[in-house]
Amino acid sequence: MPLAEKLDRKLRPADDSSDGEDYYEVTDRSSSESILETANANKDDASDDERVKSQMSKVSFGALAKAQDALSKQQSADRKRKRGEDTSKSQDDKLEALRERLRQIKAEKMANGAAGAKPKKKSEGTKKGKVIQDEDDEDDDEEDVDSDNSDTEAAPKARSSKHAPMVQSSKRMVSRKRKVVDVKKPVFRDPRFDNMGGAAPDDNTLGNRYSFLNDYRASEIAELRRTIKKSKNEGEKERLKKQLLSMESQQKARENKEKHQEVIREHKKKEKELVKQGKQPFFLKKSEQKKLALIDRFQNMKSKQLDKVIERRRKKVTSKERRNMPERRTA
């Protein structure tokens, strides 16, 4: 018997009392029956628990895991459904309130238009201001509705065609670095290489002006040769030899260039004399200039030098032909 039923018993005073004091007796006579019923219920519960335990002991762990997964999925789906219902309800309430506000504004606008069908000229400005203000309020409300709709509909607007150009705003953000006053950028000029001081001198003029450099280079080459002979360190000697070879090759290249220029100058002198005689000027191509320089070089060579140059040239040509020769096909 539960505790509440035990406490919910009625008491009344006894009729026969010899000593004038009030005694009370319990009028609830169903206590013994309720106690028996609760004992039987406890026995049934214990037997049910034992039956459930015996059944659970026979269930496999795989079935229990599947049941647990199904319950967890169902609980998560219920939570999502409740959350979605709450958000949709709140959004519907907001939209409904905004629609109601728009209806009221339109009704007020219609009422103002009907009342002011025959207005005076003085009140036209004030009514126009009111109408503009109402329109602004309506636009604001429409913007709010559009913003809510944009929140609900997150999908972007699709283009009319996949070949159509992309839509881009023409509004550009102004940079913080602005030119208030245009200042000319300073231009640095070197008078040696600038045409403002006159035309640039040609190679002959430069060679005549800086001809003393050739004497300096010749003295450096002689000094290098003396240091190579005196030095005993092999590493230092190899480095000096490389430097000497580089300087000698540069000197030879300058001499060849000077000879080439000398041949061209001789040809120009001859052409000037022929032009004075009334003949048409003839300008050599670069290939013809190279041929004349090569002929002059071979004519000024000695026999031994000429043989060496011819042998070197022959080896170069044969190696080039050997490279271009096709390889032999093998099975």
Swiss-Prot record:
Pfam families registered for this protein in UniProt: RRP36 (PF06102)
Keyword Coiled coil set for record: yes
Subcellular locations according to the entry: Nucleus, Nucleolus
UniProt xrefs under InterPro entries: RRP36
Family named by the database record: Belongs to the RRP36 family.
Record GO biological process: maturation of SSU-rRNA from tricistronic rRNA transcript (SSU-rRNA, 5.8S rRNA, LSU-rRNA)
Compositional bias (Polar residues): 32-41
Protein name: rRNA biogenesis protein RRP36
Coiled coil feature spans: 82-112, 218-277
rRNA processing found in the keyword field: yes
Chief localization: nucleus
Compositionally biased spans, kind Acidic residues: 16-25, 134-151
